[in-house]
Regions:
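Metal-dependent de-N-acetylase/amidase catalytic core
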Residues: 11, 15-16, 26, 45-184
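ATP-dependent adenylation/pyrophosphate-handling site
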Residues: 1-15
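Alpha-helical scaffolding within the catalytic cores
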Residues: 18-22
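Residue-level marker of intrinsically disordered, low-complexity segments enriched
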Residues: 3, 25-28
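A conserved beta-strand->alpha-helix junction
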Residues: 27-40
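A short, flexible beta-alpha/helix-coil linker loop
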Residues: 8-9, 39-41
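A structural preference for short, hydrophobic beta-strand core positions in alpha/beta folds
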Residues: 3, 34-37, 108
């Protein structure tokens, strides 16, 4: 697993995000992280092509077969722009003569209390059509990885509580014919 973070700071956070990223990635077994310096709270003002080029550089380096990004209709502006830029960067093998093979799958992920908060339109809804079976251990690792970030995990009924995250995995699993699953 490789992770490309376009922004690693936010003026609204007071925790040590770099430590959280390192701890979270260690829990998940991330091989390499690509960390950009684009401003989280001013993403719409960033150079769009610079963001695409940063993602393309990560694609050239790790050569993924699967790219997972935010859903385009995510309520957070930076998540929507990230999704758009990832789609553009994924076309790299078609635009340039390079040694990068095609990306076989692009999956939009579900982010609790983010993907589901946007206006409900026929175009903007998260409607999963791909599921990845996960284990109870995977769910525990996900929860542990998220827990290293201050104020991300909340008490139920918040969408990012351990109870709700587990319930979502059970619900998505039932849709996929498995005990637990993640939806894309």
């Amino acid at each position: 697993v490789y992770v490309c973070l376009l922004s690693h700071w936010s003026p609204t956070r007071d925790d040590n995000l770099e430590e959280g990223i390192a701890s979270s990635h260690a829990i998940l077994g991330v091989k390499k992280s690509y960390v950009g310096d684009f401003g989280c709270m001013r993403f719409k003002d960033e150079d769009h092509h610079a963001i695409v080029r940063f993602i393309e550089a990560a694609i050239k380096d790790c050569q993924p077969e699967v790219l997972i990004t935010h859903h385009p209709a995510d309520v957070h502006v930076d998540h929507g722009i990230t999704s758009e830029c990832c789609l553009e960067a994924a076309k790299l093998p078609m635009r340039q003569i390079c040694s990068v093979g095609p990306i076989k799958s692009i999956l939009f992920m579900e982010v609790p209390s983010s993907t589901d908060w946007n206006i409900n339109t026929s175009v903007g809804c998260f409607r999963p059509n791909a599921f990845m079976e996960v284990s109870q251990e995977d769910i525990r690792k996900k929860f542990d990885a998220i827990s290293v970030y201050k104020d991300v995990i909340r008490n139920a009924p918040h969408p990012r509580s351990s109870n709700v995250l587990t319930s979502m995995a059970i619900c998505r699993g039932s849709q996929a014919g498995a005990e637990y699953a993640e939806a894309f």
